[in-house]
From Swiss-Prot:
One GO term (biological process): seed coat development
PPR repeats: 63-93, 94-128, 129-155, 156-190, 191-217, 218-248, 249-279, 280-314, 315-341, 342-376, 377-407, 408-442, 443-473, 474-508, 509-544, 545-575
Region (Type E(+) motif): 656-686
Gene that produces this protein: PCMP-H24
Region (Type DYW motif): 687-781
Protein name, as recorded: Pentatricopeptide repeat-containing protein At4g02750
PANTHER family: PENTATRICOPEPTIDE REPEAT-CONTAINING PROTEIN (PTHR47926), PENTATRICOPEPTIDE REPEAT-CONTAINING PROTEIN ELI1, CHLOROPLASTIC-LIKE ISOFORM X2 (PTHR47926:SF436)
InterPro entries: DYW_dom, E_motif, Pentatricopeptide_rpt, PPR_At4g14850-like_plant, TPR-like_helical_dom_sf
Length: 781
C-alpha cells in the first residue's frame, strides 16, 4: 500500500512538474506572469519533495528505480537512517543504489559510513570512484582522495579534474600542476581550475604564463585573471589587461571598478562606473563600497540613495560604512528601515555597538537575532571581553556550546583572551584541548591567543612549549614571548628570544622594543638598555613613544639613577604622562627619595586626581620614613577629593573553582583552618629569620597587632590556601588586583623556602616567581 501511494504521488508530482509548469511558463510573458510562474514552481517542488519522502516499507518490489528515488529523497533531507532502511529492504541493488547511498552519506558528513559502503560494493563503476574521491576532496582529506585516485582501475576527465580542483582549492598549487601535466585529456574545466589555483594563491607570473600558452579562453577565464591583478593590487596591469579584452561583461566592469576603489583611486573608479555600458546591482554596490573603503560615507550615501535597486549586500555595505565611522545613530536608522536583514546585518550592528562600548545595546540585538552564526557569537564574546566583562564573555562561550553553536577561531580567540584577563588557567587549558581535538592548527591567529593566555596566567613554560610547536610564527608571536619572559622577571631569556627573532629575519616594531627595554630594566642591564633605546630608530625605524620612555625611566630608576631618569623626562619631545610620572614615583619610593616622589605625585594628582594607587604609594613612603603627619594629611586630602582606596583582593583557582580573599577574610568556609595554618607557618618563618615589616601600618597600633594585620593580607591568605590544597609538585598560582605589599613579598619568599613550593604571584604590575627563598623580580617591583 505504501509503495503504491508513493508511486501515485510521485507520478502526480512529476506530471505537474514537467507538463503543467512547462505550459504555464510559455504563457508567462510579462514580469508579473514570471513571478507567478516561479512562485508556483517553488510550491510544486515542495510538493514533490514531500511526496518523495514517504517511507517505503513493502518488500519484494521489483522496480529498483523507485527505490533509488526514495533513497535520494531521504538523503537530500538528511534522513540517513531512513535511507539505509530503504536500502536494506531492496530486493536487489544496482550501482545507482550504492552510489546514491554513498553520495548521500558524503553530503551529510558521514564519511566513515560512505567509505564502509564503498568498500562493501561487489562491483564499482567509474561514478562510484569519482563520488568517493569528490567526497574526500570536499572534506579536504586530500591524502585519502589521492590514495583512491592512484588505485582507480580507470579514470575519466572528471576524475582528473576532481583531484586537480581539490589541490587547487586547498593551496597545493604544485600538486595541482603535477596532476594537470599528467592528464591524458584536458577540457575547459581543467584549464580554468589550474588558472584559478594560480590566481587564488597569488602566483600571477605562473597564471600569466598559463594564460599565454593557450588561445580561445572563455570570458570567465579573462575575468579570473583580471581579478588576480586586482587582488594583488596591481592596478596598472589590471587596467592594461582590461583594455586588451575583446569582450567584457558586467563582471569585468565590476572587477576593475573595485580594483581602483580598493587602491584608493576613487575618482578613476567613479569615471569607470559612469562609463560602464551595463550596470547591475553589484556595479552600484561596488562603487558604494569603494566610497566607504575610502572613508567617503556621505558620497556613498548619496549614490546609495540613487540606486535603482538594492540587495542585501548593498544595504550591508552602507550599514558597515556608518559602523566603521562609529556613527551608530545613523547605522540604527538605516538598520530599522532595511527591508531585508541577514545574519551579516545583525553581526555588523552588534560589532559596532560592542566597539563603541555600548555592550547592553549589542546584547539586546544579539538576543533578538532570529538566527545566529559563529560570527555572531564571536562578536558578542569579543565585545564582552574587550569591554572588561570577562565573566560574561566566558558565560556566553559556555552558552554557545550548550546551544550547539559552531566554534570558530574568533570565538576561541576571544575566550582565550578572557581566560588571560581573569587568569583562568585551567579553563584556558581545556580550551587548548578543544582546539587540538577540533583539528585547529596552532597557526598565528589562535596560536598567539594561546601564547598570551599562558603568559598572562603565569605558565611561561607551557607558553614556550607551545611556541616551539607553532607551525607559523609572526611578529606578534615573538613579541608575546619576549614580553612574557620580561614580565615574569626572566629578562636574559627575553633578550635571547629577541636575538633569535632578528636571526629569523623579522624586523622589530614598537611593541618589540617596549618588551626589550622592559627586559633590560628587569635584568638591570642599564648600558644595554640605553644602547637599544638610542639606536632603535636608526637600526629598526622605531621612533620612541611614551611607553619606551616609561621603560627607560623604570630602567634608570630601578638602578637608583633617579636624577638621570628625571632629566630624561625633562628632555622628552612631549610632556610626560601620568604613567611615566607614576614610574618615577615608584622608583622614588623604593630608593626613599621623598622630595622627588612628592614632585611626581603632584604631577599625577593634577592629571589623574582620582588615582588612588598613587596616593597609596606616597602614603607608604611617608609611613616608611616615619612621617605620620603627612600620612594623615594625605588621607584627609583623599577624603576631601572623594578618592577611595581600591580594596585589595587576591584569588586562586583550584580544580576549576576560584577562591577569592580580602584582607582578614572572614567569609571563606575554611577560614579557621587557613588562619591556623598561617599561625603555624608564621612561627616556622620566624625561626628561619623572617622579620615582619610593619612600618607601613598605622603608628598608633601595638607592634603585635601590626604583625597580625599584615599576616592576614589577601595575598598571604591565598598563598596559604594554595599550599594547603594544591597537590605537591604543582606550582601555586595567585593573582592580586593591586601591587603586592612589601611585607607580603618578603613573607612569601620565606613561605616558598620553608614549604619547598614554587609560588607564582601576579600583581597589577608584573609576575613574581618565588622559589627557594628568592623572587624573580630581584626585590624590585
Amino acid at each position: 500500500m505504501e509503495i503504491n501511494k508513493f508511486r501515485a504521488l510521485s507520478r502526480r508530482a512529476q506530471q505537474l512538474h514537467y507538463t503543467s509548469l512547462n505550459g504555464l511558463k510559455r504563457r508567462c510573458n510579462n514580469a508579473h506572469g514570471a513571478a507567478n510562474f516561479h512562485s508556483l514552481k517553488r510550491a510544486t517542488q515542495t510538493q514533490i519533495q514531500k511526496s518523495q519522502t514517504k517511507p517505503l516499507l513493502k518488500c519484494g518490489d521489483s522496480d529498483i528505480k523507485e527505490w533509488n528515488v526514495a533513497i535520494s529523497s531521504y538523503m537530500r533531507t538528511g534522513r540517513c537512517n531512513e535511507a539505509l532502511r530503504v536500502f536494506k529492504r531492496m530486493p536487489r541493488w544496482s550501482s545507482v543504489s550504492y552510489n546514491g547511498m554513498i553520495s548521500g552519506y558524503l553530503r551529510n558528513g558521514e564519511f566513515e559510513l560512505a567509505r564502509k559502503l564503498f568498500d562493501e560494493m561487489p562491483e564499482r563503476d567509474l561514478v562510484s570512484w569519482n563520488v568517493m574521491i569528490k567526497g574526500y576532496v570536499r572534506n579536504r582529506n586530500l591524502g585519502k582522495a589521492r590514495e583512491l585516485f592512484e588505485i582507480m582501475p580507470e579514470r575519466d576527465v572528471c576524475s582528473w579534474n576532481t583531484m586537480l580542483s581539490g589541490y587547487a582549492q586547498n593551496g597545493c598549487v604544485d600538486d595541482a600542476r603535477s596532476v594537470f601535466d599528467r592528464m591524458p585529456e584536458k577540457n575547459d574545466v581543467s584549464w580554468n581550475a589550474l588558472l584559478s589555483a594560480y590566481v587564488q594563491n597569488s602566483k600571477m607570473e605562473e597564471a600569466c604564463m598559463l594564460f599565454k600558452s593557450r588561445e580561445n579562453w572563455a570570458l570567465v577565464s579573462w575575468n579570473c585573471l583580471l581579478g588576480g591583478f586586482v587582488k594583488k593590487k596591481k592596478i596598472v596591469e589590471a587596467r592594461q589587461f582590461f583594455d586588451s579584452m575583446n569582450v567584457r561583461d558586467v563582471v569585468s566592469w565590476n572587477t576593475i571598478i573595485t580594483g581602483y576603489a580598493q587602491s584608493g583611486k576613487i575618482d578613476e573608479a567613479r569615471q569607470l562606473f559612469d562609463e560602464s555600458p551595463v550596470q547591475d546591482v553589484f556595479t552600484w554596490t561596488a562603487m558604494v563600497s569603494g566610497y566607504i573603503q575610502n572613508r567617503m560615507v556621505e558620497e556613498a550615501r548619496e549614490l546609495f540613495d540613487k540606486m535603482p535597486e538594492r540587495n542585501e549586500v548593498s544595504w550591508n555595505a552602507m550599514l558597515a560604512g556608518y559602523v566603521q565611522g562609529e556613527r551608530m545613530e545613523m547605522a540604527k536608522e538605516l538598520f530599522d528601515v532595511m527591508p531585508c536583514r541577514n545574519v551579516s546585518t545583525w553581526n555588523t550592528m552588534i560589532t559596532g555597538y560592542a566597539q563603541c562600548g555600548k555592550i547592553s545595546e549589542a546584547k539586546n540585538l544579539f538576543d533578538k537575532m532570529p538566527k545566529r552564526d559563529p560570527v555572531s557569537w564571536a562578536a558578542m564574546i569579543a565585545g564582552y571581553s574587550q569591554s572588561g566583562h570577562s565573566f560574561e564573555a566566558l558565560r556566553l562561550f559556555v552558552q554557545m556550546e550548550r546551544e550547539g553553536g559552531r566554534l570558530n577561531r574568533s570565538s576561541f580567540s576571544s575566550a582565550l583572551s578572557t581566560c588571560a584577563d581573569v587568569v583562568a588557567l585551567e579553563l584556558g587549558k581545556q580550551l587548548h584541548g578543544r582546539l587540538v581535538k577540533g583539528g585547529y592548527e596552532t597557526g598565528c591567529f589562535v596560536g598567539n591567543a594561546l601564547l598570551l593566555m599562558y603568559c598572562k596566567c603565569g605558565s611561561i613554560e607551557e607558553a614556550n612549549d607551545l611556541f616551539k610547536e607553532m607551525a607559523g610564527k609572526d611578529i606578534v608571536s615573538w613579541n608575546t614571548m619576549i614580553a612574557g619572559y620580561s614580565r615574569h622577571g626572566f629578562g636574559e631569556v627575553a633578550l635571547r628570544f629577541f636575538e633569535s627573532m632578528k636571526r629569523e629575519g623579522l624586523k622589530p616594531d614598537d611593541a618589540t622594543m617596549v618588551a626589550v627595554l622592559s627586559a633590560c630594566s628587569h635584568t638591570g642591564l642599564v648600558d644595554k638598555g640605553r644602547q637599544y633605546f638610542y639606536t632603535m630608530t636608526q637600526d629598526y625605524g622605531v621612533m620612541p613613544n611614551s611607553q619606551h620612555y616609561a621603560c627607560m625611566v623604570d630602567l634608570l630608576g630601578r638602578a637608583g639613577l633617579l636624577e638621570d631618569a628625571h632629566n630624561l623626562m625633562k628632555n622628552m619631545p612631549f610632556e610626560p604622562d601620568a604613567a611615566i610620572w607614576g614610574t618615577l614615583l615608584g622608583a622614588s619610593r623604593v630608593h626613599g627619595n621623598t622630595e622627588l616622589a612628592e614632585t611626581a605625585a603632584d604631577k599625577i594628582f593634577a592629571m589623574e586626581p582620582e588615582n588612588s594607587g598613587m596616593y597609596v604609594l606616597l602614603s607608604n613612603l611617608y609611613a616608611s620614613s616615619g612621617r605620620w603627619g603627612d600620612v594623615g594629611k594625605l588621607r584627609v586630602r583623599m577624603r576631601d577629593k572623594g578618592v577611595k582606596k581600591v580594596p585589595g583582593y587576591s584569588w586562586i583557582e583550584i580544580q576549576n573553582k576560584t577562591h577569592t580573599f580580602s584582607v582578614g577574610d572572614e567569609f571563606h568556609p575554611e577560614k579557621d583552618e587557613i588562619f591556623a595554618f598561617l599561625e603555624e607557618l608564621d612561627l616556622r618563618m620566624k625561626k628561619a629569620g623572617y622579620v615582619s615589616k610593619t612600618s607601613v601600618v598605622l603608628h598608633d597600633v601595638e607592634e603585635e597587632e601590626k604583625e597580625r594585620m599584615v599576616r592576614y593580607h589577601s595575598e598571604r591568605l591565598a598563598v596559604a590556601y594554595g599550599i594547603m590544597r594544591v597537590s605537591s609538585g604543582r606550582p601555586i598560582r595567585v593573582i592580586k588586583n593591586l601591587r603586592v605589599c612589601e611585607d607580603c613579598h618578603n613573607a612569601i619568599k620565606y613561605m616558598a623556602r620553608i614549604t619547598g613550593r614554587l609560588i607564582i604571584l601576579r600583581d597589577n604590575n608584573r609576575f613574581h616567581h618565588f622559589k627557594d627563598g628568592s623572587c624573580s623580580c630581584g626585590d624590585y617591583w
